[in-house]
Amino acid sequence: MEVRASSSFVRTFGRRLLSPLALSSFLLFCVSNPALSQEPRIHKPPTPEPIEVTELPLPPTAPSSDLGACSTSINPHQTGCIDTAPLSFQSGSFLPDGDSALARVHFVGAPAAPDPASKYDGGQIIIVKADGTKFSNGDTWKCVTCGVPPQNAIGVGPDQGYPQSFLDGKRILEGSSIVDCSPYLLTDDRCTADRVHIYPIRWNIAPDGSGPGGNIRELRLHPDNVHLGFNGMSIGKDGFGQFGYFGRLVFNPSPQSGEPRAPRYDLTHVTRMVRQGPPAMTLERDPEHSDQLRLNFDAITVGEFRGFSKNGREAFYIGYPWESCNIDVFAVDMTTGKIRRLTSNPEYVDPLDSSPDDKWIVVEDTRGSDRQMFMAGMRGVPPIIDLLATAYVSSVRNNGPRRFFQAYLIDRYGDRGNYQGQLLTSGDGAPGSISDPNWNAMADPRWSQDGTRIVFWQAQVTSPSCGGSNPLPCPAPSEPGGRHFRMLIARFTSRIPLSVKPLAPVSDDIPWGTPYVPGTPLPKFTPIPEGTYTMRGKVAGSATVILKDGDDHRGLKRVYVSYKDYSDEPDCIINGTEEVTRLSSYSPTVFALDWHSNLVQSGKTQGTKITSSDGFKTSIDVFSNIFEATGTLTTTINGKTYRQPENGD
């Protein structure tokens, strides 16, 4: 039951002993092969622990975005009102003291200038009290970037995503900029708008150092606070591509080249997270048998960089799947290149953060929603059709702006047997509760420095992901002012606070990576030549694989696989066929497929993966994520059937 605290802004959802996620028992089956697990299955699952979830206080919501709508009757302190839209908000990290956390908000309804309250307008970074106290003005929040003079923010772009505090408590990484209030702490009353400077981050991609630099996204601060990781994206006639990068932040007070010619941070000693030479692939042609395919679990395939371990030694990433249609998070040692598979649940996982001692991770995952199970529910199938299907599969996880994530606590050794992590927001699913399925976790969750708390946020489903032609009705708003988001803290009440020493700066070099040289072309993966191949099961059986290129100069067009008693582990056998053909699309970000499956699984798991007689024809844009298909793809495991979403759902 929800318990309301004395403050109208604070809600405590109660303390519960949350059991590990009770997913279908089939998760026990067809996943014991050590090659498919990040650690040998010898570690006893952890005991469930008590978790208390509390909602943090946010600024009041404005009744509209009209000029002056944020009146003194709504906010007597005249410190701003925020929008209600779910994507107008994003929680960030804790500040180093653990008493406050960062958030990105969108202020609306401010009065016109010269009213002092006019500065509470547009996208801004705020600090939210997490310890029940208030700032000196009586608010539980403080806007750091509101009213910063234009001359203090030259060349700064609009991106304010994923706000992360530096350990000095004086700086914030927001989007592709750094907010700096030195010499004062961000929480200090002396940290006022006129003392704040916002510096853009520039990645030089031109041989002569000219221009504005390259586009960088999904920035994550390294624990040494000297380096950061980021993603660089390319969209062109050859399709959609992305690479992860690692570089050093260097403050440049007076740039002599490039734009902007204003104080900024430059990224130096940049390394692309790709092995030098032709990039390796998880599915590859056997170098000793050119007519055979094999799985190379040592291949580093950083599809999207997602962060770092707290000891600074590993980079986290979403990579090419180790099982068909199963998108997981991996960790790669930045010195040795050794890979760990952090998750193996067949659902989609993306946002994550590691605890200060690296004994736990918090992930946001679609597990429990069955969103991906119609594609990924059959375990032990090698990732062969994924040569064409991976981008499509990963894009089904969302319905437009809606995510189907929930937050889970997982120990270092990952998913194994019946242990599939501990859900942070367990409950009865009542409307408006933290377990309401119409409220979903959003990126990124963040640990406190002492390892006893996680800050994260949820968004409520809104149109167009519900209502209208969508089969899901839109739920009524349950938050103050009708906002569709909330900022939460999960407290691990039985844990003893950790004391973690600051990390010394790590090396600029990634020995296995490729040093970035401005102006050089992106690396190209060497595709497996078209032809007919055999892939042998590790235990028994084989698969016949036919790869066929298209005549549109875009490479692979068709993948056909026929399984004959294929088995990568004892008593887990795959028979049948799968075929995926790439269809023409109007955009490089749209993936259209003609998919045919007729698989049967036998042994300790009984299952089928079957398409309708005319196949499963489907397309999706990797940015808009709207599901559309004709025909059906259905997976049944041990009597439980998983079906695709409805179109537009």
Each language-model region and where it sits:
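N-terminal secretory signal peptides that target proteins for export/translocation
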Residues: M1-R15
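Small-residue packing motifs within transmembrane alpha-helices
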Residues: L18-L21, D353
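Bacterial N-terminal signal peptides
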Residues: P20-V31
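Sec/Tat signal peptide C-region and signal peptidase I cleavage site
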Residues: N33-S37
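Sequence signature of WD/YWTD-type beta-propeller architectures
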Residues: Q38-D649
